[in-house]
Amino acid sequence: MYPVRNLETWEALGTMSAHYSVKSILHTTATSCLAVVCLVGACSAGIISAQVDVYDLHMRGLMGALASNASDIQVTGQEAHHNSTVVAWVNVDGTQINYPVAQPTSTMADDYYLHHAIDGTPHSLGCPYIDRRSSKDGQHVVVYAHHLASSPLLFGELANRYQQDAFDKLGNATWRSVEDGKVDRTTIFQPLCALRVPASYEAIQRFSFTSIEDMKAWLTELAREASACTENWQTAISGARRVLSLITCTEGNGHSMRRTIVIFVSGDQSEAG
Protein backbone atom coordinates (compact mmCIF):
# COMPACT_ATOMS: atom_id res chain seq x y z
CA MET A 1 0.00 0.00 0.00
CA TYR A 2 1.17 3.51 -0.75
CA PRO A 3 2.48 4.93 2.55
CA VAL A 4 0.17 7.52 4.03
CA ARG A 5 1.21 9.69 6.94
CA ASN A 6 0.11 13.02 8.42
CA LEU A 7 -3.17 12.70 6.54
CA GLU A 8 -4.85 16.02 5.77
CA THR A 9 -7.24 17.30 3.17
CA TRP A 10 -6.24 19.27 0.12
CA GLU A 11 -8.54 22.26 0.29
CA ALA A 12 -9.21 24.20 -2.89
CA LEU A 13 -11.75 26.87 -2.06
CA GLY A 14 -12.93 28.26 -5.37
CA THR A 15 -14.26 31.80 -5.22
CA MET A 16 -15.45 32.80 -8.67
CA SER A 17 -15.68 36.29 -10.11
CA ALA A 18 -17.23 37.73 -13.23
CA HIS A 19 -13.75 37.53 -14.78
CA TYR A 20 -13.68 33.74 -14.23
CA SER A 21 -10.86 33.92 -11.71
CA VAL A 22 -10.48 31.63 -8.73
CA LYS A 23 -8.80 32.06 -5.37
CA SER A 24 -7.63 28.70 -4.11
CA ILE A 25 -6.63 27.94 -0.55
CA LEU A 26 -4.60 24.75 -0.64
CA HIS A 27 -3.37 22.77 2.34
CA THR A 28 -0.91 20.14 1.16
CA THR A 29 1.11 17.42 2.83
CA ALA A 30 4.14 15.47 1.67
CA THR A 31 1.82 12.58 0.87
CA SER A 32 -1.26 12.97 -1.30
CA CYS A 33 -4.71 12.42 0.11
CA LEU A 34 -8.03 12.51 -1.71
CA ALA A 35 -8.11 15.82 -3.55
CA VAL A 36 -10.71 18.39 -2.63
CA VAL A 37 -12.93 18.62 -5.65
CA CYS A 38 -15.82 20.83 -4.62
CA LEU A 39 -16.60 24.41 -5.51
CA VAL A 40 -18.29 27.07 -3.43
CA GLY A 41 -22.07 26.96 -3.60
CA ALA A 42 -22.50 30.51 -2.34
CA CYS A 43 -21.67 32.15 -5.67
CA SER A 44 -24.41 33.94 -7.52
CA ALA A 45 -26.44 31.80 -9.89
CA GLY A 46 -25.55 34.07 -12.79
CA ILE A 47 -21.79 33.69 -12.30
CA ILE A 48 -22.07 29.92 -11.90
CA SER A 49 -24.20 29.76 -15.04
CA ALA A 50 -21.65 31.78 -16.99
CA GLN A 51 -18.84 29.52 -15.79
CA VAL A 52 -20.79 26.43 -16.83
CA ASP A 53 -21.68 27.85 -20.25
CA VAL A 54 -18.06 28.72 -21.08
CA TYR A 55 -16.78 25.37 -19.88
CA ASP A 56 -19.54 23.48 -21.68
CA LEU A 57 -18.67 25.13 -24.99
CA HIS A 58 -15.01 24.22 -24.54
CA MET A 59 -15.80 20.58 -23.75
CA ARG A 60 -18.32 20.28 -26.57
CA GLY A 61 -15.61 21.27 -29.01
CA LEU A 62 -13.36 18.48 -27.80
CA MET A 63 -16.20 15.94 -27.79
CA GLY A 64 -17.20 16.92 -31.31
CA ALA A 65 -13.66 16.33 -32.47
CA LEU A 66 -13.62 12.87 -30.91
CA ALA A 67 -16.96 12.00 -32.49
CA SER A 68 -15.77 13.08 -35.94
CA ASN A 69 -12.63 10.98 -35.72
CA ALA A 70 -12.50 8.51 -32.87
CA SER A 71 -8.79 7.89 -33.37
CA ASP A 72 -7.67 11.52 -33.33
CA ILE A 73 -8.75 14.08 -30.74
CA GLN A 74 -6.25 16.81 -31.50
CA VAL A 75 -8.58 18.89 -33.68
CA THR A 76 -11.00 20.99 -31.66
CA GLY A 77 -13.72 22.82 -33.57
CA GLN A 78 -12.00 24.83 -36.28
CA GLU A 79 -8.71 25.07 -34.44
CA ALA A 80 -5.91 22.55 -34.03
CA HIS A 81 -4.64 21.97 -30.51
CA HIS A 82 -1.79 19.78 -29.39
CA ASN A 83 -3.67 17.99 -26.62
CA SER A 84 -0.73 16.00 -25.36
CA THR A 85 -2.21 16.38 -21.88
CA VAL A 86 -5.22 14.22 -22.79
CA VAL A 87 -4.34 10.77 -21.47
CA ALA A 88 -7.83 9.27 -21.52
CA TRP A 89 -11.51 9.90 -22.07
CA VAL A 90 -14.21 8.86 -19.58
CA ASN A 91 -17.92 8.38 -20.18
CA VAL A 92 -20.48 7.11 -17.66
CA ASP A 93 -23.81 5.80 -18.93
CA GLY A 94 -26.83 7.27 -17.18
CA THR A 95 -25.03 10.59 -16.59
CA GLN A 96 -23.72 13.53 -18.59
CA ILE A 97 -20.14 12.57 -17.73
CA ASN A 98 -18.21 12.56 -21.02
CA TYR A 99 -14.83 14.24 -20.59
CA PRO A 100 -11.18 14.15 -21.54
CA VAL A 101 -8.89 13.25 -18.66
CA ALA A 102 -5.49 14.72 -17.84
CA GLN A 103 -2.66 13.72 -15.51
CA PRO A 104 -0.17 16.10 -13.88
CA THR A 105 3.37 15.78 -15.17
CA SER A 106 6.38 15.66 -12.88
CA THR A 107 6.81 19.43 -13.27
CA MET A 108 3.22 20.27 -12.29
CA ALA A 109 1.61 20.59 -8.88
CA ASP A 110 -0.48 17.59 -7.87
CA ASP A 111 -3.62 19.75 -7.94
CA TYR A 112 -2.81 21.55 -11.22
CA TYR A 113 -5.93 20.34 -12.99
CA LEU A 114 -8.21 21.42 -10.17
CA HIS A 115 -7.88 24.92 -11.60
CA HIS A 116 -6.76 24.41 -15.21
CA ALA A 117 -8.73 23.19 -18.22
CA ILE A 118 -7.49 20.27 -20.28
CA ASP A 119 -5.48 22.56 -22.58
CA GLY A 120 -3.73 24.25 -19.65
CA THR A 121 -5.93 27.35 -19.68
CA PRO A 122 -6.50 28.65 -16.12
CA HIS A 123 -10.09 27.83 -15.21
CA SER A 124 -11.74 27.48 -11.82
CA LEU A 125 -13.67 24.38 -12.87
CA GLY A 126 -10.53 22.48 -13.79
CA CYS A 127 -10.93 19.12 -15.53
CA PRO A 128 -10.97 15.43 -14.58
CA TYR A 129 -7.49 14.15 -13.82
CA ILE A 130 -5.72 10.98 -12.76
CA ASP A 131 -3.98 10.73 -9.40
CA ARG A 132 -0.24 11.07 -9.97
CA ARG A 133 0.34 7.71 -8.23
CA SER A 134 -2.00 6.01 -10.68
CA SER A 135 -1.73 5.48 -14.44
CA LYS A 136 -4.20 5.39 -17.31
CA ASP A 137 -3.59 1.69 -17.97
CA GLY A 138 -2.93 0.62 -14.38
CA GLN A 139 -4.75 -1.95 -12.28
CA HIS A 140 -6.38 0.83 -10.27
CA VAL A 141 -7.11 4.12 -12.03
CA VAL A 142 -8.15 6.96 -9.69
CA VAL A 143 -9.78 10.04 -11.25
CA TYR A 144 -10.79 13.28 -9.51
CA ALA A 145 -13.09 16.06 -10.69
CA HIS A 146 -14.97 18.94 -9.11
CA HIS A 147 -18.49 18.82 -7.72
CA LEU A 148 -20.04 22.17 -8.60
CA ALA A 149 -23.05 22.92 -6.41
CA SER A 150 -26.42 22.75 -8.19
CA SER A 151 -24.85 21.59 -11.45
CA PRO A 152 -24.35 18.19 -13.12
CA LEU A 153 -21.09 19.45 -14.63
CA LEU A 154 -17.92 17.39 -14.17
CA PHE A 155 -18.51 14.78 -11.41
CA GLY A 156 -21.46 16.55 -9.79
CA GLU A 157 -23.78 13.70 -10.78
CA LEU A 158 -21.70 11.26 -8.74
CA ALA A 159 -21.95 13.08 -5.41
CA ASN A 160 -25.06 11.23 -4.18
CA ARG A 161 -24.29 7.81 -5.65
CA TYR A 162 -23.41 6.42 -2.23
CA GLN A 163 -27.18 6.21 -1.82
CA GLN A 164 -28.43 2.88 -3.15
CA ASP A 165 -31.33 4.26 -5.20
CA ALA A 166 -29.02 6.75 -6.93
CA PHE A 167 -26.31 4.14 -7.44
CA ASP A 168 -28.77 1.77 -9.11
CA LYS A 169 -29.30 4.33 -11.90
CA LEU A 170 -25.62 4.31 -12.88
CA GLY A 171 -24.56 2.57 -16.06
CA ASN A 172 -21.19 1.35 -17.25
CA ALA A 173 -18.12 3.56 -17.49
CA THR A 174 -16.21 3.59 -20.77
CA TRP A 175 -12.50 4.34 -20.44
CA ARG A 176 -10.64 5.28 -23.60
CA SER A 177 -6.89 5.31 -23.15
CA VAL A 178 -5.14 7.91 -25.32
CA GLU A 179 -1.60 7.73 -26.68
CA ASP A 180 -0.03 10.45 -28.84
CA GLY A 181 -3.39 12.14 -29.31
CA LYS A 182 -5.14 8.98 -30.49
CA VAL A 183 -7.51 6.56 -28.77
CA ASP A 184 -5.32 3.53 -28.13
CA ARG A 185 -7.59 1.19 -26.17
CA THR A 186 -11.16 1.11 -24.88
CA THR A 187 -12.21 -0.65 -21.67
CA ILE A 188 -15.74 -1.07 -20.29
CA PHE A 189 -16.09 -0.94 -16.50
CA GLN A 190 -19.26 -1.91 -14.62
CA PRO A 191 -20.35 -0.21 -11.39
CA LEU A 192 -19.42 -2.20 -8.29
CA CYS A 193 -20.08 -0.01 -5.26
CA ALA A 194 -20.00 3.51 -3.84
CA LEU A 195 -18.89 4.96 -0.52
CA ARG A 196 -19.06 8.24 1.35
CA VAL A 197 -15.80 8.55 3.25
CA PRO A 198 -13.58 11.06 5.09
CA ALA A 199 -11.19 13.06 2.92
CA SER A 200 -8.25 11.19 4.46
CA TYR A 201 -9.69 7.76 3.59
CA GLU A 202 -6.68 5.49 3.24
CA ALA A 203 -8.14 2.27 1.88
CA ILE A 204 -8.77 3.61 -1.62
CA GLN A 205 -5.15 4.72 -1.98
CA ARG A 206 -3.81 1.46 -3.40
CA PHE A 207 -2.47 1.50 -6.93
CA SER A 208 -0.72 -1.85 -7.28
CA PHE A 209 -1.26 -5.35 -5.94
CA THR A 210 0.85 -8.43 -5.34
CA SER A 211 -1.64 -10.57 -7.27
CA ILE A 212 -5.16 -10.60 -8.71
CA GLU A 213 -6.31 -12.34 -5.53
CA ASP A 214 -4.83 -9.51 -3.47
CA MET A 215 -6.81 -7.01 -5.55
CA LYS A 216 -10.02 -9.04 -5.15
CA ALA A 217 -9.56 -9.21 -1.37
CA TRP A 218 -9.13 -5.43 -1.31
CA LEU A 219 -12.27 -4.94 -3.42
CA THR A 220 -14.23 -7.26 -1.14
CA GLU A 221 -13.32 -5.15 1.89
CA LEU A 222 -14.41 -1.98 0.09
CA ALA A 223 -17.69 -3.51 -1.06
CA ARG A 224 -18.51 -4.68 2.45
CA GLU A 225 -17.89 -1.17 3.74
CA ALA A 226 -19.85 0.50 0.93
CA SER A 227 -23.31 1.97 1.46
CA ALA A 228 -24.36 1.08 -2.10
CA CYS A 229 -23.46 -2.00 -4.13
CA THR A 230 -24.47 -3.74 -7.29
CA GLU A 231 -26.68 -6.73 -6.54
CA ASN A 232 -24.13 -9.26 -7.81
CA TRP A 233 -21.05 -7.61 -6.35
CA GLN A 234 -19.36 -10.90 -5.40
CA THR A 235 -19.64 -12.13 -8.98
CA ALA A 236 -18.37 -8.80 -10.31
CA ILE A 237 -15.32 -9.01 -8.05
CA SER A 238 -14.59 -12.61 -9.02
CA GLY A 239 -14.09 -11.55 -12.64
CA ALA A 240 -12.34 -8.24 -11.94
CA ARG A 241 -8.92 -7.50 -13.39
CA ARG A 242 -8.90 -3.70 -13.29
CA VAL A 243 -10.53 -1.00 -11.14
CA LEU A 244 -11.67 2.54 -11.95
CA SER A 245 -12.48 4.88 -9.03
CA LEU A 246 -14.17 8.23 -9.70
CA ILE A 247 -13.93 10.64 -6.76
CA THR A 248 -15.58 13.95 -5.95
CA CYS A 249 -16.70 15.95 -2.92
CA THR A 250 -19.96 14.81 -1.38
CA GLU A 251 -21.07 18.37 -0.69
CA GLY A 252 -20.40 21.07 -3.28
CA ASN A 253 -19.86 23.79 -0.70
CA GLY A 254 -16.13 24.43 -1.00
CA HIS A 255 -15.17 22.94 2.35
CA SER A 256 -16.52 19.40 2.27
CA MET A 257 -14.59 16.97 4.44
CA ARG A 258 -16.21 13.94 2.81
CA ARG A 259 -15.70 12.29 -0.55
CA THR A 260 -17.98 10.18 -2.68
CA ILE A 261 -16.09 7.32 -4.32
CA VAL A 262 -17.74 5.35 -7.10
CA ILE A 263 -15.87 2.14 -7.90
CA PHE A 264 -16.12 0.33 -11.24
CA VAL A 265 -14.51 -2.97 -12.22
CA SER A 266 -13.59 -4.62 -15.49
CA GLY A 267 -12.48 -8.03 -16.65
CA ASP A 268 -10.14 -5.97 -18.87
CA GLN A 269 -11.70 -7.10 -22.10
CA SER A 270 -10.25 -4.09 -23.87
CA GLU A 271 -10.58 -3.32 -27.55
CA ALA A 272 -7.83 -1.63 -29.49
CA GLY A 273 -8.69 1.75 -31.00
Positions of PLM-derived features:
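N-terminal Lys/Arg-rich, disordered targeting/topogenic segments
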Residues: 1-25
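Intrinsic disorder/low-complexity segments
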Residues: 13-19, 36, 71, 224, ...
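Intrinsically disordered, low-complexity serine/threonine-rich segments
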Residues: 20, 24-27, 34, 263
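Hydrophobic membrane-insertion alpha-helices, especially the h-region
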Residues: 27-46
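Solvent-exposed, non-transmembrane regions of membrane-associated and secreted proteins
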Residues: 41-273
